Amino acid sequence: MKSKLQFKWLAGFALVLMSGVAIAADLPRQMVEIYRIAPGQHVNFLKLIAMYDAANVEAGLPPRQLYVHADGASWDFLIIQSDDDWTPAQRTKVAEALKRMGAPTGAKFFLEIRKFMAEHTDTVATGPTTAAQWLKQLE
């Protein structure tokens, strides 16, 4: 129970980490992912994420924002990435890059990444913004 509460708190905290302000009517969607890694699998997890980041960059998309645990709760890595839809061209470029790299995709990715995780959670949020900017949506 304590672990689940910590993950929920961390997801909220992640939103604070995303600095900058967007116009309230045009907030981007962000995927916030929190990972607790299986013992001894930290390097392998980061290598897999680095491969997917390289595919993003090759397709003209930004790499994920990675935060590494320094103190406090029981998580290891926090990742923030865009949840906005990619164009068909971007999807094709990412898929081609991943295939060329030999990276697992689809069901194989689902199984591969879970080799490294003890626990994870993800959520979609809008932002970054401020309370004042967000409240303007109510006008």
Question: Which residues does each predicted region cover?
Answer:
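Bacterial N-terminal signal peptides that target proteins for export
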Residues: K2-F13
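Short, low-complexity N-terminal intrinsically disordered segments enriched in polar/charged residues
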Residues: A24-R29, V57-E58
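Active-site-flanking beta-strand signature of metal-NTP-handling nucleotidyl enzymes
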Residues: P28-R36, L78-I80
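Short, surface-exposed ligand-recognition loops at beta-strand->loop->(often short) alpha-helix junctions
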Residues: R36-K47
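An amphipathic, aromatic/His-enriched active-site/gating alpha helix that lines ligand/cofactor pockets
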Residues: M51-L66, S82-T130, L135-E139
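A short beta-turn/loop motif at secondary-structure boundaries
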Residues: Y67-S74
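Short, solvent-exposed polar/charged micro-motifs at secondary-structure junctions
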Residues: W75-L78, W134
